[in-house]
C-alpha cells in the first residue's frame, strides 16, 4: 500500500510542476494563485479518487462549479475533523 501512496504523491508533484497557467487557458492569474488552486484540485483528486476529476476541477481556469464543489468538500472534511476534537481543559 505504501507504494501506491508514493505513486500518488509522485504523480501529484509531477502534475504541479509540469503545468503552467497558459497550458489550461488561464491568463491574468498569478503563479502563486495558480499553484494554490492546482494543489486544491490535486488534493481533491487524491482524496476522492475521481477519474478525470483534476481536469474538471481545472476547467474554466478554476472558476467552474466543479472547483467550487471541490473546495467546499475539502473544507467540510476539515470541519468534520475539527468537530471531533475535545477541548483540553
Swiss-Prot record:
Coiled coil: none annotated. Gene3D superfamilies: Crustacean CHH/MIH/GIH neurohormone (1.10.2010.10). One of its GO terms (cellular component) is extracellular region. It is found in: Secreted. Its main location: secreted. Expressed by the venom gland. Residues 1-18 form the signal peptide. Keywords: Secreted, Signal. Belongs to the arthropod CHH/MIH/GIH/VIH hormone family. May increase the toxicity of alpha-latrotoxin and/or other venom components. Is non-toxic to mice and to the cockroach Periplaneta americana. This is Alpha-latrotoxin associated low molecular weight protein SGV242-280.
Amino acid at each position: 500500500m505504501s507504494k501506491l501512496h508514493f505513486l500518488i504523491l509522485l504523480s501529484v508533484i509531477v502534475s504541479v510542476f509540469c503545468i503552467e497557467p497558459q497550458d489550461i487557458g488561464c491568463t491574468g492569474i498569478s503563479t502563486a494563485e495558480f499553484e494554490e488552486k492546482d494543489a486544491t484540485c490535486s488534493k481533491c483528486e487524491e482524496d476522492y479518487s475521481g477519474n478525470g476529476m483534476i481536469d474538471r476541477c481545472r476547467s474554466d481556469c478554476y472558476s467552474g462549479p466543479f472547483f467550487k464543489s471541490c473546495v467546499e468538500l475539502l473544507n467540510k472534511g476539515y470541519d468534520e475533523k475539527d468537530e471531533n476534537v475535545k477541548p483540553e481543559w
